[in-house]
Design a protein with these regions (language model features):
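Beta-strand segments within the central parallel beta-sheet cores of soluble alpha/beta enzyme folds
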Residues: 1, 78-81, 316-322, 378, ...
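Non-catalytic, structured segments within soluble enzyme domains
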Residues: 1-201, 364-367, 378-379, 383-384, ...
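Glycine-rich, acidic and aromatic/proline-enriched surface loops and short helix-turn segments
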Residues: 2, 6-9, 26, 30-42, ...
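Conserved catalytic neighborhood of penicillin-recognizing serine enzymes
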Residues: 26, 93-96, 266, 311-373, ...
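Short beta-alpha connecting loops at secondary-structure transitions
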Residues: 47, 285-289, 332-341, 390-393, ...
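Active-site SXXK
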Residues: 66, 135, 195, 267-268, ...
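A penicillin-recognizing enzyme superfamily signal
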Residues: 125, 129-132, 136-138, 167-171, ...
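Mid-domain, small-residue-enriched loop/turn segments at the edges of structured enzyme/sensor domains
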Residues: 331-336, 369-407, 423
Length: 535
């Protein structure tokens, strides 16, 4: 009984008594004990902190059963029914830094091994809690907004609901125990459904009614033509999220994944890190572990190499069709295209980057030389072997991680210096003894990897991207002149990027679809990743 999970990270009734009520188990009142007694059946569904209504109904039922079975008197039962419960204040767990915590655990374990869990280590990190929460919310909001525009795939499951209202609540709680809430994305059991209205029960015990625009994402599931596996009917387990006006919207768990990371370009200190949509569902950290094609977000590094070779922002390059036969490519013939399929002829370098013109990028790389551009990219922290010296490098056909991209864009942000990302600043043991103390290094000339003039011109070029180019939504939102960045979409439209910076922060948002479908239309200005990047 002292090993059973009872919610709120409590294992066993002794721990639950302390966590929920802040007292030893022997000091619990009948009402408090009844509340804990209801937890084993469904710790999440009957958690009084998260689901007070459902938990209270369960508690009241248990008190009544205790009286009926002679464990307490009528007077004790009446008093227990009336007693208001006061819970111990819960620690704030709203930062949502699960990926940060796991990354820290891995870093510490690599240094201290098995002692990581036995020495009571206290680890201080560079992450800012407010930045972390904003990043978490923004990424999830962007992915959920995208998912609402996709074809509805159907309910997560179906459950047979009893006709007797007395048994209904327990059946709902049992069903939702296998489909826990995902933060703001709530699991719900449908009680009644029609094309105009859906009534469903949440894990908290609350009943919600969804109508109008809240049904649009699941319209196909409410159609008479819906198949048995996609139809929303009584007993269907669906997902609901609150809209900006507080109204409920039916949706589904995203199939797309994403990541966000921001660092201080002056020091390399990581300020926020979100490795995916849901750590509980997928612990793979896409910020540090996902090697993906950067697409057009890699073009600035090709342009930077061109500046070193004598190009300027006013250099004219022809945006005209290109064709490479098998002899030139060493494999298959290649006829690259611009995203919009249009060619605009001779244009300035700054216009070409703002419009993300593929033909110009390829011609620039031809002039610079693929070997030189590959070596130049390593100055920003990229791995040469992941960026083969071919012309496809101009379109971002290599492999990067979001953390690499944030670090690389920091070079432009800080005037040409390379900083190494850092997460841990201080470690002490359970006796308070200092084991590690790392202060962010001051940027100096020993860290310079590109000329300050190169970084300055690149910042001006990337400012044109956010002012009037593929990332113009950034300027339209903030009306600030100190925001610079570049969008990126891979040729197969499976990955979408936005990398941007201002003098004190560099950030990267990446979104991708692992399913065999295009993530977005082949438009480098797509609105999918920009909302998360703007926030």
């Amino acid at each position: 009984m002292n090993q059973i999970f009872l919610g709120q990270r409590a294992y066993g009734f002794a721990a639950a008594a302390e966590i929920y009520f802040g007292k030893p188990i022997k000091e619990l009142t009948i009402a408090e004990a009844a509340m804990l007694a209801g937890l084993p059946q469904a710790p999440s569904a009957y958690n009084p902190i998260a689901n007070p209504q459902r938990a209270t109904r369960r508690q009241q039922y248990i008190i009544q059963r205790m009286y009926e079975n002679g464990f307490i008197t009528e007077e004790q039962a009446e008093a227990a029914h009336r007693q208001p419960l006061r819970y111990r204040p819960q620690s704030d767990s709203g930062t949502h830094a699960e990926y940060v915590a796991e990354t820290v655990r891995q870093l510490v374990h690599s240094q201290y091994g098995d002692e990581t869990t036995t020495r009571g280590l206290d680890v201080h990190v560079t992450v800012d809690s407010s930045d972390q929460l904003v990043a978490y919310r923004a990424l999830r909001r962007g992915l959920l907004n995208y998912e609402r525009r996709q074809v509805y795939r159907g309910p997560e499951d179906y459950v047979d609901l009893p006709a007797d209202p007395a048994d209904l609540d327990a059946r709902i709680a049992e069903a939702l125990a296998d489909h826990p809430d995902n933060d703001e994305l709530k699991a719900a059991v449908v009680l009644e459904a029609s094309p105009r209205k859906v009534v469903a029960a949440l894990q908290s015990g609350e009943s919600i009614t969804v109508t109008g625009d809240g049904l649009k994402p699941v319209t196909s599931g409410l159609s008479e033509k819906a198949g048995p596996k996609t139809q929303i009917r009584r007993g269907a387990i669906v997902r609901a999220v609150k809209g900006p006006k507080g109204d409920w919207i039916l949706t589904q768990q995203p199939e797309v994944e994403g990541a966000f990371v921001s660092i201080d370009p002056r020091t390399g200190a990581i300020r926020a890190l979100v490795g995916g949509f849901d750590f509980g569902k997928n612990k793979f950290n896409h910020v540090t572990q996902a090697w993906r094609q950067p697409g057009s977000s890699f073009k600035p590094f090709i342009y930077s190499s061109a500046l070193e070779k004598g190009f300027t922002a006013q250099t004219t390059v022809n945006d005209a069709p290109l064709f490479f036969d098998a002899g030139a490519t060493g494999s298959q013939p290649w006829e690259p295209k611009n995203y919009d399929g249009k060619f605009e002829g001779p244009m300035l370098l700054k216009q070409a980057l703002a419009k993300s013109k593929n033909m110009v990028s390829i011609r620039v790389l031809q002039a610079v030389g693929t070997q030189y551009a590959q070596e130049w990219a390593t100055r920003f922290g990229f791995d040469a072997d992941k960026h083969p010296p071919y012309l496809t490098m101009a379109l971002g056909a290599g492999s990067v991680t979001p953390l690499q991209m944030a670090s690389a864009y920091s070079v432009f942000a800080n005037g040409g210096h390379r900083v190494n990302p850092m997460l841990i600043t201080r470690i002490t043991d359970n006796q308070g003894r200092l084991l590690r103390d790392v202060q962010p290094p001051e940027v100096d000339e020993s860290m310079r990897v590109i000329d300050a003039r190169n970084a300055f011109v690149m910042t001006q070029l990337l400012g044109e991207v956010t002012r009037a180019g593929t990332a113009a939504a950034v300027h339209q939102t903030f009306r600030r002149a100190d925001l610079y960045g570049k969008t990126g979409t891979t040729n197969d439209s499976m990955d979408a990027w936005f990398a941007g910076y201002q003098p004190h922060l560099a950030a990267v948002v990446w979104i991708a679809d692992y399913t065999p479908r295009k993530l977005i239309d082949p438009d480098p200005g797509s609105g999918l990743r920009l909302p998360a990047g703007r926030e």
